Amino acid sequence: MDIIVHPRVLQRHPDLSEADVLSAWENMISFLPRLESSPMRYIAIGSDPRGRLIEMVAQKASDGTWVIFHAMTPPSKKTLIELKFVRR
């Protein structure tokens, strides 16, 4: 499975490296499809090598490559609720 991190992620979040985001994707703790989006996007939380939780949003390109176009740490409260990590 090919995975790429959109360059904008690293520009907007200099506290994250490409390796951090890829590791978090590979070590996903939880993910859900966002059914209302077209093309379908997935929201996920995973941990990087330092144990930080990273929120990610990705979609699958037509060639099967996953493109992570949003990542940040720590995850937002909205994402934690959406993925059932915390209650409202």
Regions found by a protein language model. Give the residues of each.
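Ribonuclease/tRNase effector modules and their secretory precursors
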Residues: 1-88
